[in-house]
Amino acid sequence: MEFTTAMFGTSLIFTTSTQSKHNLVNNCCCSSSTSESSMPASCACTKCGCKTCKC
């Protein structure tokens, strides 16, 4: 049971780190059409892996 949980945790982290269009942590989506000036303060694009975000 512990091994399965560890494997699931690893796969979840891997999926989150490679997912560029949507960030499950801060519920932020990448958008190339959104300007940085209109980006909400709650948006953390560094976690999204993109320059601009659409929340």
UniProtKB/Swiss-Prot annotation:
Q: Which UniProt keywords apply?
A: Copper, Metal-binding, Metal-thiolate cluster
Q: Which InterPro entries match?
A: Metalthion_11
Q: MF terms per GO, please? A: copper ion binding
Any matching Pfam family? Metallothio_11
Per the record, the similarity remark reads: Belongs to the metallothionein superfamily. Type 11 family.
Recorded protein name is: Metallothionein-1
